[in-house]
Structures are given as structure tokens and as C-alpha cells.
């Protein structure tokens, strides 16, 4: 159905969902009047040009020796990233409560959480940040991992964290957050730009948040943050791809699992096993939330020859990696893990640099998949 909307109208018509925003570009002459436009459809010419650019930048692949290095030393590249940027790279993701109201279960009318001023901040947020050293992009996250201990302790090495987790007894009645009635796990938490807004928004003492990251440096930054409260949050180092590493909570114990620009950072052939394991952690009725890069996003089109690892999988200049998904690929990953689709949508956004008169087309995919009631395995 062909729908056009005046700028600023609600996106209730034609089945458009409001969470992705309601600023629509009906007059191309006004493109530089705002920093971003929502639900922007591509022309056939744009789609063909995007496909051509991807074919072009995929012709020259990274050699196998370097590919092995990026995989074996993936934690080193992410640790270097956080040592350089610390907690100054990403902004706190307050927009998540509009997209994923499941993250604030005690609040009502979450769709109205953002005022117009807050929504302006969201648009500005999407324009900021670096996707590695080469691109101006919103998000950048990795294969998940982090560390144990409280903020009064000296920084923990990854080895000591792993050892503590190995000796932690995980049973039905005794584990971190066992007394909570609502449990959230963020995989790939970085320096806490999702975790801390969740804790600040939810004052319910029965809510507990786990967060993990592949980078011990990132987890250390979470644990030493003044907002980190070990009575409400448990941060730990974890490699999402390592099937021998256990989680600090039992199966069927989590209400929500969050994957924000994380799954795209791991090797494609390891994604399914990672989702399978996470699915087993969900309670029956629990939900997995994902937001990640979509096929032909601006970031993919800007990669140069020699940065392609495999089809739609690239390495950035800093050694971190990124994959660009289709909706069908993500649907297959989640349904194969035994989850049921609640939402699988493409967010097409036109970002504008008014100073340089540049337009940048972003493509993100947002998913919600639920574990069926009555299911006790992933």
C-alpha cells in the first residue's frame, strides 16, 4: 500500500508502528529541515545501487590468516576499543523503553515515555558515535562478555573472573539474583549504556539485571561506575561463542534477554548455537529482544575492498567485525532455537548532516521472539 503522511503525523495509518518515530518526509525539498526522517522507503534505483556497492566491496576478501587472527584475538580488539574510548563513546540508550517496553515492566503507558524534547535527543543520538574509526554510526557492539565482583574490589582480570564463575554453584534456589521475580540479561553490555538506564528507570527491588560482555575492560568499566549496584546488577565476562562457558543463572530463569548490536559481531556460523543456549535461559513466556544492522545499511555500503571476511560480514579498521542481517536470517535463527515471532521489523531511517548537506540511509532490524508457554528447553 502506498501511504504518504504529513510531517509529524502519528504513524498509526497503514499499520506503521509509532515506536520507530513519526517524522515522515513527504516533501523531498524539506530533507535538510531535520536531522532524521522515519520509515523512509528506498527507490528501485537506490536498492540497485546499494546491491552494486556490496558486490563491489565483497570482491576482495581478507586472507584466511588474518581472518583467523580476528577470531582468535577478538577479545583483544574489543579490549583495545574500550581502553581507548572508555565510557565516552556511546550515549545511554533511553530510547529503548519506547522500542522495548518489556525493559520497564512496572511502568504504564510506556509508549508516551519520551517527550518531544526526549525524542529530539533520540534523533541526535542516532547521528552521533563512531562505528569503528571509519564511520559515523550509532551503535557498535560485539560478541558478549564481562566480569564478577563488586565495585569496592580492585579491577578483576579475565582469568580471575572466569575462575570465580567456574566455582559459582548454579542451582534452582541459589544464584545471583535468585530472590528477584523479574530478571533481565543484557548480552554485550559494553560500558553499561543499556544497563544503567534500565536500573534508573526501574525502582522495583524485585527486578534484577545481569550484564555480560566479551571485553573484560568493558565489564571493569561497568563495575567501577558509580551507578553500579551489586544488589541489583551482576556484571560478568562471557564469550557468547564459547559453549564450554556457563552462565551464572540456571535455565528457564530469565524474563528478558537483550541483544543490542551484538549478534552481528560474531562469526555467522556460530550465531545459531549462541541463540540456542540463550533460549534455554528464558522462562516459558520469556522474550528475546534484538536490534541490529540490516542488509545494505550505510555502514555496509561504506566498507572498502579488502575489508570483507565473507558474504555480508566485514572487519572494521580497529579489528572488530560486523554482519548485516536480513529479516529472514534472523527469523530462522530464533525459530530454530524454539522461539515464536512476536515482532520482526525493518527500521529504515534517513539521517541528515545539515552542515555538510549529506544524507545517510540507515537500515536496522528489530526483533522480539518469545519462548512458548509450557516449554522448558530452548
Curated annotation (Swiss-Prot):
One of its GO terms (biological process) is tRNA methylation. It is found in: Cytoplasm. Its main location: cytoplasm. GO terms for molecular function: tRNA (cytidine) methyltransferase activity; tRNA (cytidine-3-)-methyltransferase activity. Gene3D superfamilies: Vaccinia Virus protein VP39. S-adenosyl-L-methionine-dependent methyltransferase that mediates N(3)-methylcytidine modification of residue 32 of the tRNA anticodon loop of tRNA(Thr)(UGU) and tRNA(Arg)(CCU). N(3)-methylcytidine methylation by METTL2 requires the N6-threonylcarbamoylation of tRNA (t6A37) by the EKC/KEOPS complex as prerequisite. Belongs to the methyltransferase superfamily. METL family. This is tRNA N(3)-cytidine methyltransferase METTL2. The lineage of its organism: Eukaryota, Metazoa, Chordata, Craniata, Vertebrata.
